[in-house]
Structure formats: C-alpha cells, structure tokens
Amino acid sequence: MHTIVLATQKGGSGKSTLAIGLALAAKEAGHTVRLIETDPQGTLSNWQSRRGIAEPMVETIYNVGRIEARLEALARGGVTLAVIDTASGVSAVTAAAIRCADLCLIPARPTITDIESSAATLKAVRAWHKPFAFVLNQTPVRGRRIDNAAHALRGEDAREMNELVARPFISMRNDHQDASASGLAVGEYAPTGKSAEEIRQLWRWAEARLNGLQRHSRSDAISPVRLASGVAQNAETAPAQPLPAWDACL
C-alpha cells in the first residue's frame, strides 16, 4: 500500500479538494482507496455526508497514536492507496502522518504568502527524510506568475524540477467548488472537463513517482529523497535554507 499525505502550513490551499480528487482518480484507475481525515474541521466527512455513496470511505483519525497502526491494518485488508488530509500547520497528528508517508504533497497557491508558508511544512518533511513535491493549486489558467512560482519552489537546480514540483498545475475553475458542494469529485461532476483531466494527470504523475521510489528502494539505489537547492541531507544538523526568489511570484 502507498500512502500520500497532503500537508501545508497555510489554510485555504485546497488540500481537501486535492485529496478527494486524487482519491477518486486513483479509484478510477483500479486502486482500492481510503481517505483519511486528520483535520477536525471535517471537510472530508462533510463531503461524504453530502455524497451518499460509500466509496471511497472516509475515516477520521484525530489520535496521533492510531495512525501508523491503522495504516498497517488497511494494508493487510487490501487497501492499495491511503490519502491523508491534514489540518493546517504541523501538529503532532500531521507529523505522525508525514512520518508514515510514502510521498508528501505540499499544495501552494502561486502567491508569496503561500510559498513562504510552505517552508515550515518542508522542514517537517525533511526531518523525516520523506519524498515530497509541491503542487501548485488554484492557479490562473495562464500567465507568467505560475512558472515564476514553480521556479521559486524548486530552487535553482533545474534537474530537480520534475520531482520537486508536480505536474500539471491545477487551475482555478468552478468545477472544483461545484463538485464539492454536490458531494462529488471533479472527475465525477464534469468527467470530460479540463479540471477533471488535470486531476487525472496529477494522479498519474504521483503514481509514477511512487512507483519510481519503490523501484529505487528495492534496488538499494541512492535515496530518492530530493532536497531543494543545496540543503544538507540531515535536516537535524544543518540549518534550513529559505526557498529562493519569493519576489519572482509578484
């Protein structure tokens, strides 16, 4: 079983909407999926209550001591993908989820405040040496601001671009909000729309990344954890460096 954790310091970045979209895209692709909610705000639970459909099941876990054991039980029960939605900030529960992740996705809108706020989440992810990627979310349909934000997030090493910033960027369209209000994922609400296709492509990107990490692990290759532009491998002994070029997003 693979575990994807969506985490970020700042609220309003679209973690829950992305979690729902990725879960349904993975289900469409044949996975047995479980959505796990660790955010007391209850966005996923409220979505499921509007949905009236059992799958994918949403589980709430607010106790830090339950996460690892529950993930192990889900794997034994045949679940192939767990998608964990977390509260804003880095609480003890969020830290536990990150510790169990195979891949951490850090959503960020293409704004200076979102990009700056991602540093705290990135520090927690690095502390556990977890593979991660930023997801540029709620972006304008077009414009230089998007690419500038992507370059600010990935740092100065162009070789890291494909791993540090997920593709495609997720554009801001009404389909996401309308789908959520209807208890649906965007791929169900408007299956032939551009938003649905972006989410499917994002899932394919994430799945390819997960499979690549698994292959590296099995072959005892160099660690797949990719750290941004020159940051030391051990986050506990080296000072974290700020993500560069914030003003490029303005």
Predicted regions and their residues:
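P-loop/Walker-type NTP enzyme "switch/lid" segment
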Residues: T3-Q9, S13, G21-A96, A179-S182
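Beta-strand-loop-alpha "switch" segments that mediate conformational coupling across diverse proteins
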Residues: P140, A150-G187
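Walker A/P-loop
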Residues: S16
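Structural beta-sheet core signal
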Residues: L35, I84, I106, F134-L136
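Inter-lobe coupling/hinge region of RecA-like P-loop helicase motors
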Residues: Q177-W203
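Inter-motif core of Ras-like GTPase G domains
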Residues: S91-I112
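P-loop NTP-binding site
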Residues: H216-L250
